[in-house]
A protein has these predicted regions:
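H-loop (His-switch) and adjacent beta-strand-loop-beta switch element
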Residues: 75-88
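ABC ATPase C-loop
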Residues: 19-20
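H-loop/switch region of ABC-family ATPase nucleotide-binding domains
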Residues: 62-63
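A short, surface-exposed alpha-helical micro-motif characterized by mixed small hydrophobic
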Residues: 68-70
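Helix N-cap at the start of a conserved alpha-helix in ABC-type nucleotide-binding domains
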Residues: 38-40
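Helical segment within the ABC ATPase nucleotide-binding domain
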Residues: 42-54
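Catalytic Walker B motif of ABC-type/P-loop ATPase nucleotide-binding domains
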Residues: 27-30
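ABC ATPase nucleotide-binding domains
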Residues: 101-131
Length: 131
């Protein structure tokens, strides 16, 4: 099928594949998992992590803080066009930052996956600013 006849998620996968085929050692990706279903989001992010481990420099934007927690070493937070924070994803993406960015109270759950610590956010309610 032609590019114009495939779904939005399939188009996004094609765009990611095109970036990889170019063999650039630095990849800048604007929301590479946009329009992808849950499984394909994971596949794309896992491939990005694999590329980073193989020596690629990856810069990507995401509105999914869990992607940054699970797949990124470092995070830079921008809110309303202003630089807010930078550092390791585990340090920067915390409960207070989620409240500040999204107006949602969260708890961070930690587990071990493949002998590595993995952290995920669980929303528990909206913050006082929304009440």
């Amino acid at each position: 099928r032609g590019f114009g006849r495939i779904s939005g998620g399939e188009r996004q996968l094609v765009l990611v594949a095109r970036a990889l085929v170019q063999n650039a050692k630095i990849l800048i990706m604007d929301e590479p998992t946009a329009n992808l279903d849950y499984g394909n989001q994971y596949r794309v992010m896992a491939k990005i992590k694999e590329l980073a481990a193989g020596g690629y420099t990856i810069i990507l934007s995401t509105h999914n803080p869990e992607h940054a927690l699970l797949f990124a070493d470092k995070s830079f937070v921008i809110q309303k066009g202003e630089f807010v924070a930078a550092g390791s994803s585990a340090e920067v993406l915390n409960e207070e930052m989620m409240r500040r960015l999204y107006g949602v109270d969260v708890r961070i759950l930690t587990t071990e996956i493949n002998e590595e610590e993995a952290r995920v956010f669980v929303p528990v309610g909206t913050s006082a600013r929304d009440k």
